[in-house]
Amino acid sequence: MVKESKFSYNSKDEKKYSLGKTFRGDIFNVPETHDMVRSLFDPTVKKSVSDYLIVLSLFINGIVYYYSPVTWRIPVFIVLYSFWRLGYNLGIGILLYKQSKSHSMFHWLKQIQINGGWAKKFVELELSSKLNAQQLNSVPDEFKTWIVFRSLVNLILMNDFTTYMCLVFACSDGAFNQSLSLIFLRWVLGISFFIFNIIVKLNAHLIVKDYAWYWGDFFFRLHNNEELIFDGVFDLAPHPMYSIGYAGYYGCALMTKSYTVLIMSIFGHLLQFLFLNYVETPHIEKIYGDDNLSENTISVNKRDDSVFIGTGGKPLVMLTKNFNWLRTNDIFTVVLALYASIVPIFLPASYNNSIIILAIVVKIGTSFVLNSVLYLQSRFKSWTLSFIKNYGTINISILDNKELLERLSFQNWTLLQNNTLVLNYSMLFTISVREVMYNEKFWQTEWLPLRFILAALMILGQFLTVHQMIDSIGLFGWYYGDFFIGVLSSHKSEVTTLSRSGIYHFLNNPERVTSNLTVWALYLLFNNSNKIFLVIALLFTMNNLIVLNFIEKPHMVKLYGEQNVLKHTSGIEKSINSLFLPNHVQGTIVKLSGSIDKVIQDSSKVIDEFIRNKHNQKPKELSLKKRRNSFQQVIELIRGSTDDTLTINLQELNDQGQLQLLNLLRKDDTDFYNLGDPIKVEWNMEDHKGKDKAWIGLYNIFQTSETRTKTLVSSKGYWIPIHREKYINLSDKIRNEEDCILEDELNRGVVQFSAELLPWVPGTYELRLHANEKHEVLAISKPFDIVVKKIDVPTSDDIGDERLEDFANKLYQGFVSKLFPAVESIEDESNWFLQMHIKENARQVEKLCSTLSQSCGVHLTKKAIVDEKCLKDLSFKISKLRKMLDELML
């Protein structure tokens, strides 16, 4: 982030002055100033006493380096560098902190001018060297304070750099005691880092000029410097002068091959971040506005509050954030982490391979579950629908509040995602600790200290990035909230586009780069001792790519549009293009990236279409289709067969009897009965002799298609004798009732399958006429389907009693009266309760549950049915469910 400046005020161009404004409100022209190097070393620029003292101190550093014993150089310059680095980050930090809070440096200067003495003379001499007489009279004391402060900054920063470079030279003795290839690689990378550092610093100074370089906004404001903007290297990384602006440190460590240089570089860099966090950032927030009070941050916080209100509070993140001792889920997560990361550590070394395999299996399993949930939720709202099935059908009051239902289902998802994430990283911790404890090869690894340092930095990088991501997109974004929740009514004006603040300004998908840093850090640390860490790293990386390209990206395009998702240029991309890449190279990269995106999109569409087709065909429909196709294949094989014996058997079937379906329905060239409707069949036999005890069975055609001359499977009780009097000793009295055998003549008759003689499973069926108490087939009916009749569910907000009763009566006549004849009406509470709770009726209740779910297009549980007082109340619940499902699928 940089301060916008439309005027140049520190270089000789057509506009030498810009307006400044003190915190007291005084307006003044800002005189021209010069950068640090030019102020000290350009002979055309007038020098002050402090400039000569600074140059002298630099020569003293060189003299100390030259004359100090070789064995003393490193410790001497460690001390000197530490002194100047602390002078920078601690000394300047304290001065700026006090200046920000109470303008203390301004008051000190005023006090010096009042008290007089050598300090006043020194300040006047310093100012007269930097400003002419006219400028001295026109600029306010705040600007004069800044000029004096610049001299102190020049002293500290130049000595900080010089002592660091002296330390680098002192530690360079072992820079060339390696193989030529490694030396070449180290120096190429080191020089590249150093040059990159110089480019970043120069570009940063070109943009922010002396005003920001010397913390001018601690002393006064520029009139045209009202807000923070992003430009140049400030698009490349957050706070580039303090982050990537220290790449040269690590380049020097590479060139010298010195752990001392590396550790001191990390030390200096860490102090710089502390300076940024405790000095600069609070002042930036004070002057330019707090990031936490920005429009995006406020919107993100409001959205999180809206989503998690009434659901137990904000969910746990990474074991510590939002932890609540009174929430069982949080305690469970911590116990899970402790159990998975500590208990396995104390198992014998012989368990190493088993634990590693378990970690891989856990990662594959949890990834499959999470990815499947996200994919199906994006396409079909499957997670929310499942939640409605298991919770909404029990608590009907929730069906009046779509937002609450979505929030509750989302809360359950956050628990699943967080626990699986904790479990996976706990397992990684376990196998890493066991590798250190039990694998002797690990301690023989080359460059082990360097590996430890780099691994720690990579893990820290992922940790900090995750926090920045959560700060930018909130818990809602971290947990893929827009997969589960639409725009909240209380939040319609908030966060309706993708967030481009924080880390998302620099990277479109920071998780693509940073979410796998930990596993690759472990690979870097352990790859010499155990190659399985490469498999683990690749597994995590592949899963990340699958989620981003095949699940998250298509969903984001669907919600926010292709232009906003695929065509947006990140800050890093813009900066690299403008600073390092020619136009023709940029064009080639754009084309290549577009080609890769197209391949990914095409692959995603193919997978999406395949799964969508499978999902849209319900299991029952697939089963019916499979069975019907199987039957047709069997018939075609039979008809096309040249087997003489088979032909004779078929002819015998036609001659011995016939079965004619009487009340068959037909639609779209398909013969069918509605589930529960009686099936009437007329039978005929020319030769009745010896067949008095013939019977007709009802079979699923998929089970009987293997043979046409003999039935090899049980009828499962779905059968009727053709003559009532021939089965007088039949224990099953239902088959002796008159509603089963409607007509009974010698050579013909009519029977009816109804009530418990009907299968309550949709499918393709046939009727078979069998010989006396045997399974030899005399005749077979043509195949027909038994289907569930679809009943329109009223879903309007103002559904009245009349429409509700009409709907309930359709359910009663279509299904309930056939399964539970004792229930007399839709408001019969006593018989409904009795029938629903009789143990012997459990199977009938399950049939009703399945049938109503298919007929009404909702997912009902057995508990959802038995908990209602009567059928009318159940109908009202189904109406509410259907309305909720329709709203979710919009």
Curated annotation (Swiss-Prot):
Gene3D superfamilies: 1.20.120.1630, 2.60.40.2840. One of its GO terms (cellular component) is endoplasmic reticulum membrane. Its main location: endoplasmic reticulum. InterPro entries: Phopholipid_MeTrfase, Phosphatid-EA_MeTrfase_fun. It is found in: Endoplasmic reticulum membrane. It is an enzyme of class 2 (transferase). Residues 1-51, 97-150, 201-227, 280-330, 376-446, 490-531 are lumenal. Pfam families: PEMT (PF04191). One of its GO terms (molecular function) is phosphatidylethanolamine N-methyltransferase activity. GO terms for biological process: methylation; phosphatidylcholine biosynthetic process. Signal peptide: none annotated. The chain crosses the membrane at residues 52-72, 76-96, 151-171, 180-200, 228-248, 259-279, 331-351, 355-375, 447-467, 469-489, 532-552. It comes from the Eukaryota. Pathway: Phospholipid metabolism; phosphatidylcholine biosynthesis. It catalyses: a 1,2-diacyl-sn-glycero-3-phosphoethanolamine + S-adenosyl-L-methionine = a 1,2-diacyl-sn-glycero-3-phospho-N-methylethanolamine + S-adenosyl-L-homocysteine + H(+). Residues 73-75, 172-179, 249-258, 352-354, 468, 553-890 are cytoplasmic. Its EC number is 2.1.1.17. Catalyzes the first step of the methylation pathway of phosphatidylcholine biosynthesis, the SAM-dependent methylation of phosphatidylethanolamine (PE) to phosphatidylmonomethylethanolamine (PMME). This is Phosphatidylethanolamine N-methyltransferase. The lineage of its organism: Eukaryota, Fungi, Dikarya, Ascomycota, Saccharomycotina. The gene is CHO2.
